[in-house]
């Protein structure tokens, strides 16, 4: 399975920042996109970005969709944070929501799966699954969703959007929802290490050392080696 991750906007995108200028949306989007990529890939899901997420230039929506359509991706997910008002002052608009293309049953299924995880993990107001004429959901060949992870024009939510722990929760919620849609069980990172080779314990090391010393002493006593020093 393959997921195309779209991190919305870039450094040169006009506006798209909190009223106090401490948060630019593209920075939040890219952080979550990278963590989403990590979590999907550790579950064996192939991923790609819809554009170079290190560039300062905002890649056009048509280019993003063209890349996704040529990639053979099974799911397209666009990462965003929301805004309300004129952007110059804090407003009361708040909450989490997700957009799909009208009539997309698969898009609806993905959105509901992500919504379930997000509302549980993030503690934000549930604004629900919505349909709108968004370019990226309407011009991609695969099921597509656009996620708004909270409002950077809302003072309290902006503080959350700047917090790395909250961003990680966003990525985990998105990943859990996508994986649920794909029929892949979520694995906590600690669970992944259960089957990792264990380091020899100190007792085992002492046991091996003692055995080696005994062997060396026996070889010396038999005259096989004369220059072995066993302390």
For each feature predicted by the language model, list its residue ranges.
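Sec-exported extracytoplasmic/periplasmic mature domains
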Residues: 34-45, 69-73, 115-123, 175, ...
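Short, charged, low-complexity patches
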Residues: 25, 29, 107, 111, ...
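Short, low-complexity, charged amphipathic interaction modules
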Residues: 196-231
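Extracytoplasmic/secreted envelope proteins and their assembly/folding machinery
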Residues: 33, 37, 61-65, 73, ...
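Catalytic-core regions of hydrolytic enzymes
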Residues: 1-96, 100-108
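Active-site-adjacent mobile loop/cap segments within catalytic or ligand-binding domains
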Residues: 4, 10-17, 71, 75-78, ...
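Active-site-adjacent substrate-binding region
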Residues: 106-130
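Short Gly/Pro-enriched loop/turn and capping motifs at secondary-structure junctions
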Residues: 104-106, 134-136, 151-154, 200, ...
């Amino acid at each position: 399975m393959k997921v195309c991750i779209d991190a919305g906007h870039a450094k040169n995108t006009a506006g798209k920042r909190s009223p106090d200028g401490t948060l630019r949306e593209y920075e939040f989007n890219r952080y979550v996109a990278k963590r989403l990529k990590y979590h999907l890939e550790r579950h064996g899901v192939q991923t790609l970005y819809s554009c170079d997420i290190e560039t300062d230039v905002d890649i056009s929506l048509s280019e993003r969709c063209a890349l996704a359509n040529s990639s053979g991706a099974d799911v397209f997910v666009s990462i965003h944070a929301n805004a309300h008002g004129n952007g110059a002052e804090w407003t009361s608009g708040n909450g989490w929501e997700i957009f799909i293309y009208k009539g997309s049953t698969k898009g609806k299924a993905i959105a509901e799966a992500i919504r379930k995880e997000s509302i549980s993990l993030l503690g934000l107001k549930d604004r629900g699954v919505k349909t709108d004429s968004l370019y990226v959901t309407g011009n991609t060949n695969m099921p597509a969703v656009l996620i708004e992870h909270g409002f950077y024009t809302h003072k309290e939510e902006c503080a959350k959007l700047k917090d790395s722990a909250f961003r990680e929760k966003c990525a985990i919620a998105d990943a859990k929802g996508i994986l649920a849609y794909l029929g892949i069980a979520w694995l906590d990172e600690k669970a992944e290490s259960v089957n990792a080779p264990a380091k020899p314990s100190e007792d085992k090391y002492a046991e091996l050392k003692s055995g080696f010393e005994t062997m060396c002493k026996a070889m010396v006593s038999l005259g096989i080696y004369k220059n072995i020093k066993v302390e």
